[in-house]
A protein has these predicted regions:
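Immediate flanking context of iron-sulfur cluster ligation sites
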Residues: 16-28
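Zinc-dependent deaminase
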Residues: 17, 30-97
Length: 97
């Protein structure tokens, strides 16, 4: 849930929790919890590399931004350099195990 950490740091840096002029770049599709935090922070655009059919919450699973309870929907660009993102994630977790 690196998105949560980044949003917290950005809020400290910019002096507020509304990050309306900010874009977020991540390697993996955010989960539903992180998608909710992205929405609450009013992130302008979300870019992610690899889709996550198992735990994703943007284009997979609950599709948080498509729910009627979602009050802010960032522009979403998924699948950016997906193969490279997937490879980076696999290599990262191989080292961790």
């Amino acid at each position: 849930h690196a998105e949560m950490l980044v949003l917290q740091e950005a809020a400290k840096t910019y002096g507020g929790t509304r990050l309306v002029d900010c874009d977020l770049y991540v390697t993996l599709e955010p989960c539903a919890m992180c998608a909710a935090a992205i929405s609450m922070a009013r992130i302008r655009r979300l870019y992610f590399g690899a889709s996550d059919p198992k735990s994703g919450g943007v284009e997979s699973g609950p599709r948080f931004f498509s729910q009627p309870t979602c009050h802010h929907r960032p522009d979403v660009y998924g699948g950016i350099d997906e193969l490279r993102s997937r490879t980076m994630l696999q290599e990262f977790f191989e080292v961790r195990r």
